[in-house]
Amino acid sequence: MSNEIFIKWARELQSIAQAGLHYSKDKFETERFERIRNISAEMLSKISNEPIDKIKDIFCCEKGYQTPKVDVRSAIINEGKILLVRENNGLWSMPGGWADVGLSPAENAVKEAFEEAGANVKAERPVAIHDWQKNNGKNFESAVSVYKIFFLCSYIDGKFKENIETIESGWFLFDELPERCSVKNTNEQIKLCFEAYDDINFICRFD
């Protein structure tokens, strides 16, 4: 049996436990839901060989009814090349990250482009709205429910500066993408962004 089904079960247990902790007023029930949450973390730790503390930091720190997180990616394409950033782990990705409260999805795309790539951009239109687990995540982190929004962005100007998240940036043709790409964006998703760039009538893809 593949790890994927165990990740799915752990994800469901985590969601049930978090909802129970939010709504239950009974002390004994909350203790049971807390135990269910810990079991889900222990399952993921065994599957992934990641430390239990790391798992709990990711999955056991939220409160309230569990809803998907939102990740925004900026597809900055200029003269047929896409701007990617190299993360501290050596992997390349489109600039992006968790959407900040108080900003619209498009505003988040603009912010992430500047913070991670030093690029001033304009968010033109959405390319895709994807469920991370269905398109990107096959490791333990895919247990987090994430919606990924890709925006096609026009490049204005900018200058890269190394920062706490990225150490390098570069422009790439689709046929010359770096080998070590992050799971934060697949080659298929990058290809969709090029298709949107080449076709003004491109229709946003969604799960």
PLM-predicted stretches and their roles:
Residues 10, 17, 37-40, 117:
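Long alpha-helical scaffolds
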Residues 27-30, 34-73:
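Acidic, metal-coordinating catalytic segment for phosphate/diphosphate chemistry
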Residues 56-93, 121, 125:
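N-terminal strand-loop-strand
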